[in-house]
Amino acid sequence: MSTREGSLWGGRFADGPSDALAALSKSTHFDWVLAPYDIVASRAHTVILYRAGLLSEEQRDGLLAGLDSLAEDVADGSFTPLVTDEDVHAALERGLIDRVGPDLGGRLRAGRSRNDQVATLFRMWLRDAVRRVAAGALDVVGALVAQAAAHPEAIMPGKTHLQSAQPVLLAHHLLAHAHPLLRDVDRIVDFDKRAAVSPYGSGALAGSSLGLDPDAIAAELGFASAADNSIDATASRDFAAEAAFVFAMIGVDLSRLAEDVILWSSTEFGYVKLHDAWSTGSSIMPQKKNPDIAELARGKSGRLIGNLAGLLATLKAQPLAYNRDLQEDKEPVFDAVAQLELVLPAMAGLVGSLTFDVQRMAALAPAGYTLATDIAEWLVRQGVPFRSAHEAAGAAVRAAEQRAVGLDELTDDELAAISPALTPQVREVLTIEGSVSSRDARGGTAPARVAEQIDTVAATAARLRERLGGPA
């Protein structure tokens, strides 16, 4: 049987918890990351207790000095949890009491419960963590923009269903991976509006009767406001689920980018060469250069999706207010952040180090009769109904297939036999350069439009980075 040492409860219990219960309840192996935030919140709580007349000036100063000492020891690693500490809160209270004594140290817990305490600390930690994740995502965007700017006119095969479809600019394709990541970061910016609400002062569920000021401590801790409902504040974790969704979405977006790198670096595609520093070899096949970063990023996305699904499953069907199930809310989110902090810099480095074989991409761009749509649209511009234009373009593809030639290799007579409207002027669009240049509407793959996209994406990334408090 365990003792109650290291617990914040026990007066009505004759015996300590069973060893099995103590082992199950223990959370210091993952919630210790909240320790710096716990101490910051305890400093603010000390000041609020003093303002409420629950501490003398001497007691306030003694607690603050003890908390400062504890913070230094936590930071340098000289104070860590003991095996008997149930959680981060119990460990830090023990550390504070060691420094200021049980009478003074025992006063800090007045007016707060672990329920409102951990809900607040989780929000504090997560508001910082999402900024780190966002910065990493913007670094990947920066790498994509740099590659796009370095290849402003390179043309490649655009694909749908993984089949050659229409020529597009490489820069256009790269920016198509940047835009989803920008939306992910924008979600993080928006997320903070809901995360910046402080549960502190809600107590276990009903609020405090000690005259504390939730708004004051919210402001002290950098929150925009205090919670309007103490039950909701202590029991809700939708903020964590929202963050977990964004993390999973980033993982999915990275996975799609990773899949392109994996395909493009294969012998069959041959679009890119991997840098030695950002690839691995084989233990048995000397010739191999493997896209492990991309494959690991693709694999991590499943883990991030699993973290989201697990968290949502934990939250469902819990009655109000707080339930101990919520001990399980942090590990999925902590893990998601840890995985992204590994994957994002690796993906930024991988993308930035890619060497593109622009000649091969250009040579493959017209393969598979990707200029057929250009024929149809050229005919429409000549006044031919699209249904007829589509039929004529399809007939041109069939004729080229029968001769095993490209569309541009059909003779003027062959084109005229397909449709009298197919005059020699159609050859203006039977080049990949003419094809991409013709797609000049907003969002299109024409060089002028893609150049605008590069500037827009770079400016958006800089604006988001500034809003998140980082360097542009």
From Swiss-Prot:
InterPro entries: Arg_succ_lyase_C, Argininosuccinate_lyase, Fumarase/histidase_N, Fumarate_lyase_CS, Fumarate_lyase_fam, Fumarate_lyase_N, L-Aspartase-like
Pathway listed: Amino-acid biosynthesis; L-arginine biosynthesis; L-arginine from L-ornithine and carbamoyl phosphate: step 3/3
SUPFAM superfamilies (alphabetical): L-aspartase-like (SSF48557)
A GO CC annotation given for this chain: cytosol
Record-level GO BP terms: arginine biosynthetic process via ornithine; L-arginine biosynthetic process
HAMAP family for the chain: Arg_succ_lyase
Protein name per its UniProtKB record: Argininosuccinate lyase
Originating organism: Mycolicibacterium paratuberculosis (strain ATCC BAA-968 / K-10)
Lineage: Bacteria, Bacillati, Actinomycetota, Actinomycetes, Mycobacteriales
Designated gene of the protein: argH
